Amino acid sequence: MKALLIIDMQKGSFKPYTLRHDTLGTIDRINSLSAAFRTNHYPVIFIQHDGTRENCFLPGAEDWEILPELERLPNDITISKTANDAFYKTSLQETLSEKSITELFITGCATDFCVDTTIKSALSKDYNVTVIEDGHTTASRPFLDAPAVINHYNWLWADMSPTKYKLAVVKTCDILL
């Protein structure tokens, strides 16, 4: 069975000082995917970073909240994490096992941190992974602008030699066909 992961799409990641590439487009595509997954009775899983007072994402604080533009339904699952890897010391793998999930479709923020780490972790745990090419975002970095970072990671993932399980990088429109 399949599941959609939506990683760290939280208010604290989308402040004016942390501008993300194509935020509204990314949100729209994630919402379209979420609706399609729900229609097909596949789980939609929000991964939410729990931070500390020293950084942002303190549970209960405004920065920690999922973006209100994302459509969330009562049956959606939310899993908290404290590290870049959504599997590290979380209930994600247990939840996926309970629901017989073998294929993950991954979206979210930030491409070069939590999204990348979670993709690689999922592969090492023998999940089939589909990265949504236009369903993840990041900010510009000191040596690369955000579109270059996103393009680089899409290229990297598409060219990886994963475990015996598959890794694909696919545009939203190709999933929604």
Regions found by a protein language model. Name each.
Residues 3, 32-35, 57-177:
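Active-site-adjacent betaalpha module
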